[in-house]
Amino acid sequence: MAQARLWTKDFVVGIGLNLSMSMVFYLLMTSMAGYAVARFSAGEAAAGFASSSFVVGAVVSRVLTGKYLDFIGRRKLLIITMAISIVASIAYMFADTLVWLLAIRIIHGIAFGAGNTAIMTAIQSVIPSSRRGEGTGYFGTATTLSTALGPYLGVVLPRAYDFPMLFAASAFMSLVAFILCFIIKLPKQELSDYQRRSKWHLKLSTLVDPAGLRIGSIMLIVGIAYAAALVFLAGYAEDNEVASAASLFFVAFAVASLIARLFVGRMQDALGDNFVIYPVFVFNLIGNVLLAVWPTMPGIILAGVFVGLGFGSLMPCMQAIAVKSVPMSRVAVATSSFFLLLDAGSGIGPIILGAIMPLTGGNGMFMLCAGLVVLGMIVYTFVHGRHRGGRPGSEFLG
């Protein structure tokens, strides 16, 4: 029987949209802590919040976006949120106090969270159900590329041209995403009777999905660990007199993750979740241990490879598990629930770790992150691995 077609025009445009949106996130996430220190003399915790306040906004918006996405319209919401992203990127240049910077970050995060939920949900209706893991993995390569290009430019642009050039780059990527919103065609999701009846019922069951929360809880834990590298690795590398290793970490992360995503999705579809998930947890663990015990140029680059194989592969695999667990009418809510907890980990991670780092040092902080990866693996075993993860999961989507 002929395999369902995956590489359509809209799937490719969706990858471009995802890349542009993710670039905005990673461009600013890795540089805002340093900007807050340089511009406003912020302390470690405040600098961490300058970075993660964006994620706070994203978490807030995801709570409601999953429920109301199909009422608003997926493409319409993408257009609105990307327009806001353009304005917010320009507004950073005019923020003259830390409070204003934080306010813009939160608003920008709200727009990103809503737009990201829209594209992550919509692309699942473009991917054939029989190729769910494979398609989600390929789609995630855009995020992978942005994890290398975004942090790299986030370090290079301020050093070469100062921070306004960084904000201009963010505005440009938002503009690219805005244009792509008019090119992509997304299938319209018909509202179920339950969705219509419960439109104004803001009960917990209508805002979040249990399957999305279960799998998202794992990403909450490991997301905190990845936030350490995202926000504090540049300073950690500089303290160890290998400042240039930080940008190379993200390049190594992206290359390793990109290679892994070319085949882990197909392996997940064919051989089951556990066959893929447990090895990527181990890779992630090794990467964090390397950061803790070998903070040299080769050690940090090698850590980037292992974290790329680990965390970089884990995210699309977990998303595929979440969306396979619900009917089509619940995909938006399940997707928003999944990313809500992933964002929460990225948001609270810099705040918690920023407070802990002065006590433990960078080495101790990354060893703590290794412990979080182990905890995430244990949680996975209890919420999914021991029940359904050992074989290809049954799918509601069709």
Spans of features found by a protein language model:
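Residue-level signature of mid-helix packing/kink "hotspots" within the transmembrane helices
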Residues: V55-V63, T147-A148, A254-L258, L262, ...
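Helix-breaking motifs and short loop linkers at transmembrane-helix boundaries and internal kinks
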Residues: S41, G73, F94-W100, G272, ...
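Helix-to-loop junctions at the C-terminal end of transmembrane segments
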Residues: S61-G73, R261-G272, M357
